[in-house]
């Protein structure tokens, strides 16, 4: 029987990766559908990745990760314990899914598109002239800005949201020296979420947080579950989306003809991506 140790090894310290990462990864994918690296197991085939994501026998083993990181008794640990209950397919998950199903539909998707367009437009207008770190000044702030839109917070708070998201997601680095920072960040996040919830309760609107509050007020969510969702949205607000935005812009600007075509016909953006 083959083990992980038998998988081919790919080395991200290879100078060729630093010089041309996309081309290097494409070459690795031609040779291997699955490999290993210093980061762990690497899935290099799209269909294989999709199969793993959809496979109900696969799990993140987040409980083991929390234990390995040595998260102490804290708001962070309490939150993680509650979130683990939502990752199985039992009663808690089914109840929460049922409570939230009505919040995502065609109308909400349309409103979100309009909100995203506003966030992107405002962030682009705020970019300084000259050379700029687009990942830091734009890509990181798009998903964080969308979170601000969800909770009716000013866009000026997007940097805080982005930094907190990055800090709590550092748990996946599996470096216990980061644990104190992660725990402190969760304390800040729960305080922030509580402030936003209190503010929206005083002036309810059509934003996503107001809708969550209404679900809680009819008894479909507990107060702690409402806060958990507000924090969970921050947790996931930056990492993959911000990285994807930066990668897409990098690749498209490397192809000026494609970039110009999209500028002339925005409907080409989706097939280009």
Region spans (language model):
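Cytochrome P450
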Residues: 1-273
């Amino acid at each position: 029987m083959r083990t992980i140790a038998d998988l081919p090894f790919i080395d991200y310290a290879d100078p060729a990766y630093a010089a041309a990462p996309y081309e290097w990864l494409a070459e690795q994918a031609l040779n291997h559908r699955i490999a290993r690296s210093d980061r762990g197991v690497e899935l290099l085939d799209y269909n294989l990745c999709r199969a793993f994501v959809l496979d109900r026998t696969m799990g993140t083993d987040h409980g083991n990760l929390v234990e390995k990181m040595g998260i102490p008794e804290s708001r962070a640990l309490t939150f993680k314990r509650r979130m683990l209950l939502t990752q199985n397919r039992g009663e808690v998950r089914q109840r929460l899914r049922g409570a939230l199903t009505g919040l995502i539909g065609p109308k909400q998707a349309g409103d979100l598109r309009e909100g995203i367009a506003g966030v992107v437009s405002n962030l682009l207008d705020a970019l300084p002239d000259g050379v700029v770190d687009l990942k830091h000044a734009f890509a990181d702030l798009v998903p964080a800005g969308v979170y601000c839109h969800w909770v009716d917070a000013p866009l000026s708070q997007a940097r805080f949201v982005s930094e907190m998201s990055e800090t709590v997601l550092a748990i996946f680095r599996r470096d216990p020296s980061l644990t104190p920072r992660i725990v402190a960040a969760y304390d800040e996040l729960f305080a922030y979420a509580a402030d936003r919830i209190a503010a929206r309760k005083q002036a309810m609107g059509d934003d996503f947080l107001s809708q969550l509050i209404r679900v809680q007020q009819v008894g479909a969510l507990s107060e702690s579950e409402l806060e958990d969702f507000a924090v969970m949205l921050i947790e996931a607000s930056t990492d993959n989306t911000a990285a994807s935005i930066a990668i897409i812009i990098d690749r498209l600007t490397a192809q000026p003809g494609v970039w110009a075509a999209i500028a002339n016909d925005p409907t080409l953006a989706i097939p280009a991506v």
